[in-house]
């Protein structure tokens, strides 16, 4: 990941499962929405794993490895759906040498032993406790990642700002205004956490 353009704050977006390019595909619409709403202030990086139709943790781990190796300044982290859970797993287990200024998790599933490849270790959040701001977003009637997943993350991140959203959105094709507002509310030169 190249150094961000002068004056722009860097955002790394970890995508959902499935195809990622084109309207209605995975995280694509949400990323395009964020780029349109945050342009001029933020630079959004949207790396995609190899063959996203067949996601594995190893593919995400490889992608995060090269993406984080290129980060030289504080970064805002966003994880959407599977991208959120793999981002948490990577951050807590690999502990990359980055400065995270905030963590945003959208429609993030909590994998149990039936999907142990993506399962988080017990007390994973202990390795992330110094991230200055954690935000959680989940639709009350999400059919892809049921609402009870949010309860798990609320318990793990006790000081998180939680946005319980009406409806059943999971991919947020029409955008997520609350996310834009929260990103813009971050302090300009706020604290960051080195993992």
Please provide the spans of the model-predicted regions.
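Short, surface-exposed "cap/lid" segments of acyl-processing enzymes
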Residues: 2-53
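Catalytic active-site module of serine/aspartate enzymes centered on a nucleophile-bearing elbow/loop
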Residues: 67-70, 175-195
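A conserved short beta-strand
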Residues: 97-111
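Gly/Ala-rich beta-loop-alpha elbow adjacent to hydrolase catalytic centers
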Residues: 78-88
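Catalytic histidine-centered segment of alpha/beta-hydrolase-like enzymes
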Residues: 55, 168-180
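Conserved alpha/beta-hydrolase "acid-adjacent" motif
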Residues: 143-149
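Catalytic histidine neighborhood in serine/cysteine hydrolases
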Residues: 43, 154-171
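Short beta-strand/loop motif that positions the catalytic acidic residue
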Residues: 130, 135-138, 142
């Amino acid at each position: 990941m190249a150094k961000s353009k002068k004056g722009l704050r860097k955002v790394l977006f970890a995508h959902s499962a499935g195809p990622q390019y084109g309207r209605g595909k995975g995280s694509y619409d949400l990323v395009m929405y964020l780029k349109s709403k945050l342009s001029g202030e933020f630079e959004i990086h949207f790396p995609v794993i190899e063959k996203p139709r067949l996601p594995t943790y190893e593919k995400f781990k490889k992608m995060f490895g090269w993406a984080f190796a290129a980060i030289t300044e504080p970064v805002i982290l966003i994880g959407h759906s599977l991208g959120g859970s793999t981002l948490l797993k990577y951050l807590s287990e690999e502990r990359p040498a980055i400065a995270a200024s905030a963590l945003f998790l959208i429609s993030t599933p909590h994998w149990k032993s039936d999907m142990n490849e993506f399962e988080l270790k017990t007390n994973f959040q202990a390795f992330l406790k110094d991230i200055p701001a954690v935000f959680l977003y989940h639709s009350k009637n999400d059919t892809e990642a049921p609402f009870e997943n949010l309860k798990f993350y609320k318990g793990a991140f006790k000081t998180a700002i939680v946005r319980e959203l009406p409806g059943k959105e999971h991919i947020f094709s029409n955008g997520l205004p609350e996310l834009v507002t929260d990103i813009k509310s971050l302090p300009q030169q706020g604290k960051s956490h080195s993992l």
